[in-house]
Amino acid sequence: VTASAEAINHAGIAARAAAEKLGEDISVLDVTGRMPLADCFVIVTGDNERMVASIVDEIEAELAEKAGVKPRMREGHRDGRWVLLDYGTIICHVQRREEREFYGLDRLYRDCPAVPVEGVEQPDRGSWAEGLDVTELGDIDRLDPLQAQSIEDLPLAGPGPDADEI
């Protein structure tokens, strides 16, 4: 299964809008094989909360103007650390670097193909997805967390908090 032409078009608009506002490490992934509710993820990094908000506003404005669509749902805008825009066929994740590294959507969806977007250079996915070989895990949904000997056995996004942070 591959993403629809409409989803690829909308994802491209979102990715270019994010690039216009200096979003970094912009990834567009075809998640049709893993997500029944969306065709593409657009994952973007912003340096700080203000930049995240600016990127989100630009994505919304460009998709409204060029595709006539508005998000069905918008989550996280108040905090500005990880904003999710759900457009149905695409879901945009605009995150601060710390959230992106910790939650690791790039790792969780490592097996999903990248969708090329003209004018947007996507990051080397290995740098975001290192440490997890999904092909060795098989179906990630079949992993039994109760069988793990330690947290390192689980396909989590990043290191857990230090003892003094708990």
What do the PLM-derived regions correspond to, one by one?
Residues I43-G46, Q95:
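Short hydrophobic/aromatic beta-strand micro-patches
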Residues I8-C40, D47:
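N-terminal first-folded block
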Residues V1-A7:
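N-terminal presequence-like segments and adjacent domain-start helices
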Residues M51-V69, L84:
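Compact, glycine-rich, soluble single-domain proteins
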Residues A148, A157-A163:
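Short linear motifs in low-complexity or flexible loops
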Residues D25-P36, K70-T89:
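Glycine/charge-rich, flexible interdomain linkers and switch-proximal surface loops
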Residues P113-L146:
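Intrinsically disordered, low-complexity mixed-charge segments
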Residues Q95-L108, V115:
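C-terminal structural segments of small proteins and small subunits
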